[in-house]
Amino acid sequence: MLEQVILFTIIMGFLISVLISPILIPFLRRLKFGQSIREEGPKSHMKKSGTPTMGGVMIIVSIAITAIVMTQKFSHLSAEMFLLLFVTIGYGLLGFLDDYIKVVMKRNLGLTSKQKLIGQIIIAIVFYGVYHYCHFSTGIRVPGTHLSIDLGWGYFILVLFMLVGGSNAVNLTDGLDGLLSGTAAIAFGAFAILAWNQSQYDVAIFSVAVVGAVLGFLVFNAHPAKVFMGDTGSLALGGAIVTVAILTKLEILLVIIGGVFVIETLSVILQVISFKTTGKRIFKMSPLHHHYELVGWSEWRVVVTFWTAGLLLAVLGIYIEVWL
Protein backbone atom coordinates (compact mmCIF):
# COMPACT_ATOMS: atom_id res chain seq x y z
CA MET A 1 0.00 0.00 0.00
CA LEU A 2 2.69 2.49 1.02
CA GLU A 3 4.80 1.63 -2.02
CA GLN A 4 1.80 2.34 -4.25
CA VAL A 5 1.26 5.71 -2.57
CA ILE A 6 4.87 6.69 -3.27
CA LEU A 7 4.62 5.54 -6.90
CA PHE A 8 1.33 7.36 -7.48
CA THR A 9 2.74 10.48 -5.79
CA ILE A 10 5.72 10.83 -8.12
CA ILE A 11 3.55 10.10 -11.17
CA MET A 12 0.91 12.61 -10.09
CA GLY A 13 3.48 15.31 -9.35
CA PHE A 14 5.13 14.74 -12.73
CA LEU A 15 1.88 14.77 -14.70
CA ILE A 16 0.51 17.92 -13.04
CA SER A 17 3.72 19.80 -13.89
CA VAL A 18 3.74 18.50 -17.45
CA LEU A 19 0.06 19.34 -17.99
CA ILE A 20 0.26 22.82 -16.43
CA SER A 21 3.35 23.86 -18.38
CA PRO A 22 1.82 24.10 -21.89
CA ILE A 23 -0.86 26.38 -20.41
CA LEU A 24 1.35 28.50 -18.17
CA ILE A 25 4.30 29.05 -20.52
CA PRO A 26 2.28 30.75 -23.31
CA PHE A 27 0.42 32.72 -20.62
CA LEU A 28 3.70 34.00 -19.17
CA ARG A 29 4.89 34.84 -22.67
CA ARG A 30 1.71 36.83 -23.42
CA LEU A 31 2.17 38.76 -20.19
CA LYS A 32 5.78 39.40 -21.27
CA PHE A 33 7.09 37.86 -18.06
CA GLY A 34 10.47 37.30 -19.67
CA GLN A 35 13.78 36.84 -17.90
CA SER A 36 16.16 39.80 -17.95
CA ILE A 37 19.80 38.75 -18.29
CA ARG A 38 22.37 40.64 -16.24
CA GLU A 39 25.06 42.20 -18.42
CA GLU A 40 27.87 41.07 -16.09
CA GLY A 41 26.86 37.42 -16.62
CA PRO A 42 28.29 35.12 -19.31
CA LYS A 43 27.75 36.63 -22.77
CA SER A 44 26.40 33.30 -24.03
CA HIS A 45 23.37 33.84 -21.78
CA MET A 46 22.22 36.99 -23.56
CA LYS A 47 20.28 34.90 -26.08
CA LYS A 48 18.14 33.64 -23.19
CA SER A 49 16.75 37.12 -22.59
CA GLY A 50 12.96 37.10 -22.80
CA THR A 51 12.56 33.42 -21.89
CA PRO A 52 9.45 33.16 -19.68
CA THR A 53 10.27 33.07 -15.97
CA MET A 54 8.25 32.54 -12.76
CA GLY A 55 7.71 28.94 -13.88
CA GLY A 56 8.20 27.95 -10.26
CA VAL A 57 4.46 28.54 -9.93
CA MET A 58 3.83 25.24 -11.71
CA ILE A 59 6.24 23.45 -9.39
CA ILE A 60 4.57 24.82 -6.25
CA VAL A 61 1.05 24.10 -7.51
CA SER A 62 2.05 20.56 -8.42
CA ILE A 63 3.71 19.95 -5.05
CA ALA A 64 0.78 21.35 -3.06
CA ILE A 65 -1.95 19.46 -4.94
CA THR A 66 -0.03 16.19 -5.01
CA ALA A 67 1.08 16.29 -1.38
CA ILE A 68 -2.37 17.19 -0.03
CA VAL A 69 -4.26 14.65 -2.16
CA MET A 70 -1.88 11.77 -1.48
CA THR A 71 -1.57 12.56 2.23
CA GLN A 72 -5.37 12.58 2.60
CA LYS A 73 -5.56 9.20 0.91
CA PHE A 74 -2.89 7.79 3.21
CA SER A 75 -3.82 9.43 6.53
CA HIS A 76 -4.53 13.10 7.24
CA LEU A 77 -2.88 16.50 6.95
CA SER A 78 -0.28 16.37 9.73
CA ALA A 79 1.65 19.15 11.42
CA GLU A 80 4.72 18.08 9.43
CA MET A 81 2.89 18.44 6.12
CA PHE A 82 1.49 21.81 7.19
CA LEU A 83 4.98 23.09 7.99
CA LEU A 84 6.39 21.77 4.72
CA LEU A 85 3.66 23.42 2.67
CA PHE A 86 3.80 26.65 4.69
CA VAL A 87 7.52 27.14 4.12
CA THR A 88 7.36 26.07 0.46
CA ILE A 89 4.48 28.39 -0.37
CA GLY A 90 5.80 31.19 1.86
CA TYR A 91 9.23 31.26 0.28
CA GLY A 92 7.61 30.76 -3.11
CA LEU A 93 5.48 33.88 -2.60
CA LEU A 94 8.57 35.84 -1.56
CA GLY A 95 10.31 34.67 -4.72
CA PHE A 96 7.23 35.52 -6.78
CA LEU A 97 7.32 39.09 -5.45
CA ASP A 98 11.02 39.28 -6.31
CA ASP A 99 10.39 37.99 -9.84
CA TYR A 100 7.42 40.32 -10.31
CA ILE A 101 9.54 43.35 -9.46
CA LYS A 102 12.19 42.19 -11.93
CA VAL A 103 9.99 41.40 -14.92
CA VAL A 104 7.04 43.77 -14.49
CA MET A 105 8.56 46.75 -12.72
CA LYS A 106 11.80 46.30 -14.71
CA ARG A 107 14.06 46.41 -11.64
CA ASN A 108 16.60 43.81 -12.67
CA LEU A 109 17.78 43.05 -9.13
CA GLY A 110 14.23 42.60 -7.75
CA LEU A 111 13.81 42.94 -4.00
CA THR A 112 16.72 44.53 -2.19
CA SER A 113 18.90 42.19 -0.13
CA LYS A 114 17.47 43.70 3.05
CA GLN A 115 13.85 43.25 1.93
CA LYS A 116 14.44 39.64 0.93
CA LEU A 117 16.26 38.89 4.18
CA ILE A 118 13.43 40.35 6.27
CA GLY A 119 10.90 38.23 4.38
CA GLN A 120 12.97 35.08 4.83
CA ILE A 121 13.42 35.72 8.55
CA ILE A 122 9.70 36.37 9.13
CA ILE A 123 8.75 33.08 7.46
CA ALA A 124 11.45 31.26 9.45
CA ILE A 125 10.20 32.75 12.74
CA VAL A 126 6.60 31.69 12.04
CA PHE A 127 7.84 28.23 11.08
CA TYR A 128 9.76 27.89 14.33
CA GLY A 129 6.80 29.16 16.34
CA VAL A 130 4.60 26.36 15.00
CA TYR A 131 7.47 23.87 15.27
CA HIS A 132 8.00 24.76 18.93
CA TYR A 133 4.25 24.73 19.66
CA CYS A 134 4.07 21.18 18.30
CA HIS A 135 6.86 20.15 20.71
CA PHE A 136 9.17 18.89 18.00
CA SER A 137 12.76 18.15 19.01
CA THR A 138 15.25 20.98 19.46
CA GLY A 139 18.17 18.60 19.15
CA ILE A 140 20.40 17.76 16.20
CA ARG A 141 21.32 14.14 15.61
CA VAL A 142 24.72 12.89 14.56
CA PRO A 143 24.16 11.07 11.23
CA GLY A 144 24.33 7.28 11.40
CA THR A 145 23.93 7.26 15.19
CA HIS A 146 21.25 7.70 17.84
CA LEU A 147 23.27 10.47 19.49
CA SER A 148 21.30 13.72 19.72
CA ILE A 149 22.54 17.05 21.04
CA ASP A 150 19.81 19.27 22.48
CA LEU A 151 20.46 22.91 21.58
CA GLY A 152 17.50 24.37 23.45
CA TRP A 153 16.84 27.91 22.24
CA GLY A 154 20.05 27.72 20.25
CA TYR A 155 18.07 25.55 17.85
CA PHE A 156 16.00 28.62 16.96
CA ILE A 157 19.17 30.37 15.74
CA LEU A 158 20.13 27.27 13.77
CA VAL A 159 16.70 27.13 12.11
CA LEU A 160 16.92 30.80 11.11
CA PHE A 161 20.41 30.28 9.69
CA MET A 162 19.43 27.12 7.81
CA LEU A 163 16.26 28.51 6.25
CA VAL A 164 17.80 31.82 5.19
CA GLY A 165 21.12 30.34 4.14
CA GLY A 166 19.65 27.22 2.57
CA SER A 167 17.08 29.04 0.46
CA ASN A 168 19.74 31.46 -0.80
CA ALA A 169 22.16 28.60 -1.54
CA VAL A 170 19.59 26.81 -3.68
CA ASN A 171 18.71 30.11 -5.34
CA LEU A 172 22.36 30.62 -6.36
CA THR A 173 22.39 27.22 -8.06
CA ASP A 174 19.61 28.20 -10.47
CA GLY A 175 21.85 29.64 -13.17
CA LEU A 176 21.88 27.11 -16.02
CA ASP A 177 19.14 25.28 -17.92
CA GLY A 178 18.02 22.29 -15.87
CA LEU A 179 20.77 22.63 -13.25
CA LEU A 180 18.59 23.23 -10.21
CA SER A 181 15.72 21.03 -11.42
CA GLY A 182 18.02 18.01 -11.69
CA THR A 183 20.02 18.56 -8.51
CA ALA A 184 16.82 19.24 -6.53
CA ALA A 185 15.21 16.02 -7.81
CA ILE A 186 18.26 14.05 -6.68
CA ALA A 187 18.48 15.68 -3.24
CA PHE A 188 14.76 15.35 -2.50
CA GLY A 189 14.88 11.75 -3.73
CA ALA A 190 17.58 11.01 -1.16
CA PHE A 191 15.57 12.65 1.62
CA ALA A 192 12.47 10.70 0.54
CA ILE A 193 14.39 7.45 1.05
CA LEU A 194 15.69 8.55 4.45
CA ALA A 195 12.27 9.83 5.61
CA TRP A 196 10.74 6.51 4.55
CA ASN A 197 13.46 4.69 6.49
CA GLN A 198 12.41 6.68 9.59
CA SER A 199 8.72 5.87 8.96
CA GLN A 200 8.06 9.60 8.46
CA TYR A 201 5.70 8.87 5.61
CA ASP A 202 4.24 12.38 5.29
CA VAL A 203 7.72 13.82 4.80
CA ALA A 204 8.52 11.04 2.33
CA ILE A 205 5.33 11.73 0.37
CA PHE A 206 6.11 15.45 0.24
CA SER A 207 9.68 14.80 -0.90
CA VAL A 208 8.52 12.45 -3.64
CA ALA A 209 5.91 15.01 -4.71
CA VAL A 210 8.76 17.50 -5.15
CA VAL A 211 10.73 14.97 -7.20
CA GLY A 212 7.77 14.43 -9.53
CA ALA A 213 7.06 18.15 -9.82
CA VAL A 214 10.64 19.17 -10.68
CA LEU A 215 11.09 16.29 -13.12
CA GLY A 216 7.91 17.41 -14.89
CA PHE A 217 9.26 20.95 -14.93
CA LEU A 218 12.61 19.68 -16.24
CA VAL A 219 10.89 18.55 -19.44
CA PHE A 220 10.52 22.25 -20.29
CA ASN A 221 13.54 23.57 -18.37
CA ALA A 222 16.24 21.35 -19.89
CA HIS A 223 18.59 22.99 -22.41
CA PRO A 224 17.44 24.90 -24.35
CA ALA A 225 15.00 26.01 -21.65
CA LYS A 226 11.50 27.05 -22.64
CA VAL A 227 10.86 28.42 -19.15
CA PHE A 228 12.82 29.35 -16.02
CA MET A 229 11.57 28.69 -12.49
CA GLY A 230 12.80 32.08 -11.26
CA ASP A 231 13.14 32.94 -7.59
CA THR A 232 9.55 31.71 -7.26
CA GLY A 233 10.77 28.16 -7.67
CA SER A 234 14.31 28.33 -6.34
CA LEU A 235 13.45 29.97 -3.00
CA ALA A 236 10.52 27.57 -2.55
CA LEU A 237 12.73 24.54 -3.19
CA GLY A 238 15.42 25.91 -0.89
CA GLY A 239 13.01 26.45 1.97
CA ALA A 240 11.44 23.05 1.36
CA ILE A 241 14.65 21.02 1.46
CA VAL A 242 15.78 22.71 4.68
CA THR A 243 12.39 21.99 6.26
CA VAL A 244 12.64 18.34 5.24
CA ALA A 245 16.10 18.14 6.83
CA ILE A 246 14.82 19.73 10.06
CA LEU A 247 11.79 17.43 10.35
CA THR A 248 13.87 14.31 9.71
CA LYS A 249 16.60 15.53 12.10
CA LEU A 250 19.13 15.31 9.28
CA GLU A 251 20.35 18.88 9.56
CA ILE A 252 24.01 17.85 9.46
CA LEU A 253 23.48 15.45 6.57
CA LEU A 254 21.94 18.27 4.53
CA VAL A 255 25.47 19.62 4.05
CA ILE A 256 26.35 16.39 2.20
CA ILE A 257 23.11 15.62 0.35
CA GLY A 258 22.81 19.28 -0.61
CA GLY A 259 26.54 19.47 -1.22
CA VAL A 260 26.17 21.02 -4.67
CA PHE A 261 24.27 23.94 -3.15
CA VAL A 262 26.92 24.30 -0.43
CA ILE A 263 29.78 24.30 -2.95
CA GLU A 264 28.03 26.88 -5.13
CA THR A 265 27.58 29.15 -2.12
CA LEU A 266 31.16 28.69 -0.93
CA SER A 267 32.42 29.65 -4.39
CA VAL A 268 30.60 32.99 -4.09
CA ILE A 269 31.84 33.61 -0.53
CA LEU A 270 35.45 32.75 -1.40
CA GLN A 271 35.30 34.90 -4.53
CA VAL A 272 34.11 37.92 -2.55
CA ILE A 273 36.64 37.42 0.27
CA SER A 274 39.51 36.98 -2.19
CA PHE A 275 38.58 40.06 -4.19
CA LYS A 276 38.05 42.20 -1.08
CA THR A 277 41.36 41.18 0.52
CA THR A 278 43.72 40.70 -2.44
CA GLY A 279 41.98 42.36 -5.38
CA LYS A 280 42.18 39.03 -7.24
CA ARG A 281 39.46 36.54 -8.15
CA ILE A 282 39.78 32.81 -7.51
CA PHE A 283 37.26 31.92 -10.21
CA LYS A 284 36.61 33.50 -13.58
CA MET A 285 33.06 34.06 -12.32
CA SER A 286 30.91 32.84 -9.45
CA PRO A 287 28.81 30.87 -8.67
CA LEU A 288 31.01 27.95 -9.69
CA HIS A 289 28.89 26.80 -12.65
CA HIS A 290 29.68 30.06 -14.47
CA HIS A 291 33.42 29.48 -13.95
CA TYR A 292 33.23 26.22 -15.89
CA GLU A 293 31.28 27.91 -18.65
CA LEU A 294 34.00 30.54 -19.02
CA VAL A 295 36.79 27.96 -19.21
CA GLY A 296 35.09 26.48 -22.25
CA TRP A 297 32.69 23.83 -21.00
CA SER A 298 29.33 23.61 -22.76
CA GLU A 299 26.29 24.41 -20.65
CA TRP A 300 25.05 20.84 -20.94
CA ARG A 301 28.42 19.44 -19.81
CA VAL A 302 28.41 21.65 -16.72
CA VAL A 303 24.85 20.64 -15.85
CA VAL A 304 25.44 16.90 -16.25
CA THR A 305 28.67 17.13 -14.22
CA PHE A 306 26.84 18.89 -11.38
CA TRP A 307 23.99 16.36 -11.57
CA THR A 308 26.55 13.55 -11.27
CA ALA A 309 28.21 15.24 -8.30
CA GLY A 310 24.81 15.69 -6.67
CA LEU A 311 23.97 12.01 -7.21
CA LEU A 312 27.27 10.84 -5.70
CA LEU A 313 26.78 13.11 -2.68
CA ALA A 314 23.20 11.87 -2.25
CA VAL A 315 24.37 8.24 -2.30
CA LEU A 316 27.08 9.12 0.23
CA GLY A 317 24.49 10.75 2.49
CA ILE A 318 22.21 7.70 2.34
CA TYR A 319 25.16 5.40 3.03
CA ILE A 320 26.23 7.39 6.10
CA GLU A 321 22.72 7.42 7.56
CA VAL A 322 21.57 3.89 6.73
CA TRP A 323 24.61 1.65 6.48
CA LEU A 324 27.54 3.30 8.26
Swiss-Prot record:
Protein topology in the membrane: Multi-pass membrane protein
Keywords, ordered alphabetically: Cell cycle, Cell division, Cell membrane, Cell shape, Cell wall biogenesis/degradation, Magnesium, Membrane, Metal-binding, Peptidoglycan synthesis, Transferase, Transmembrane, Transmembrane helix
Obligatory cofactor(s): Mg(2+)
GO cellular component: plasma membrane
UniProt cross-references to InterPro entries, sorted A to Z: Glycosyl_transferase_4, PNAcMuramoyl-5peptid_Trfase, PNAcMuramoyl-5peptid_Trfase_CS
Enzyme Commission code(s) on record: 2.7.8.13
Pfam families xref list: Glycos_transf_4, MraY_sig1
GO biological process: cell division; cell wall organization; peptidoglycan biosynthetic process; regulation of cell shape
Molecular function terms from GO: metal ion binding; phospho-N-acetylmuramoyl-pentapeptide-transferase activity; UDP-N-acetylmuramoyl-L-alanyl-D-glutamyl-meso-2,6-diaminopimelyl-D-alanyl-D-alanine:undecaprenyl-phosphate transferase activity
HAMAP family: MraY
Name of the protein in its database record: Phospho-N-acetylmuramoyl-pentapeptide-transferase
